[in-house]
Amino acid sequence: MFGYKCNLQTDTEVITYIFDYLVRVQGLTLGEAASVVAAPFWSTIANKTDMEDKEKHTYLRTLFPSLLVTGPFSIVLGYNGGLMALNDRLKLRSMVVGEKDNKVYIASEEAAIRVMEPNVENIWAPAGGEPVIVNVKEGCF
């Protein structure tokens, strides 16, 4: 599909190629690509009051319908300058995010974050299909 050849034949490989195609080839932002892969339901789009947001999501769902990933997934995607975490739009796979100082922790459950940072200050569970985009400052690590 789109010139990619899946060698491993795993969902991880397919999702990686989808993001490469959307971001690198098509020029979408990470947030827009997330809105394709874990697209809001048509009823959710129809109920949006922000017309610009409504038109954007309608456009993306119409233009890239075959790139919607309908099964359960929770991914962390690295890119030059940071990372993005995303789970499926139904939240069939859990994902929790925590923050402490200038660090961000992402795991499938809060307990895993607390093992890494017992005094984590801000913990939340993003909604299904809500991307968490973390930009890393140059020279931090």
Put a short name on every predicted segment:
Residues 1-141:
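Conserved short alpha-helical segments that host acidic/polar catalytic motifs at enzyme active sites
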